[in-house]
Amino acid sequence: QDAFQLGGSSFAQTQNKIGTEVPTIKDADCFKRAFNTIQTLILDNQILAGHDIGSGGLITTLLEMCFADVDLGANIDLTVFEEKDVVKVLFAENIGIVMQAKDDSVFESTLNNNNIPFYKLGTVTTTDNLQLTADNSQPSTVNIQLSTYRDIWFETSYLLDQKQTQHHQATARFE
């Protein structure tokens, strides 16, 4: 429910900036309702997959969700957001969760009944592709080949893991 702010984000850090405006929780009651509603949806087995939007923003969340399997991709429609600056939409670290619903109608009615704002972003595919459609002054589509970025992601994670754990444990997780 907050504007897409890049202050304090990983993206801002890559630009050697800190920023002055950061995302925040504007409505604590809504946050609490969302948390409790998601717990209910989990108990009712209505969530197939989920990931918080945190460090790295929405793009990192989408990539990490797709990295879970080699035949897992998504078609995402970013035009559902009022914000037209695609960089802000993808890299702002606003509080949020991306979830894959078991049954869209049950999921959506549960969120609506609990007054939880949400966006339907797209669909899961069985491809090696994350397709992002945006409207940043004119419609455009970007296709990301997931296998390329998955390899980079896991290699980087492995190198970091080596510094944080015993070498053989990092190697076992990587292989």
Residues of each region from the PLM?
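Intein/HINT protein-splicing elements and their conserved insertion hotspots or analogous self-processing inserts
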Residues: 1-91, 104-175
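Short hydrophobic/aromatic beta-strand micro-patches
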Residues: 98-102
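Short, surface-exposed beta-edge/turn micro-motifs
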Residues: 94-96
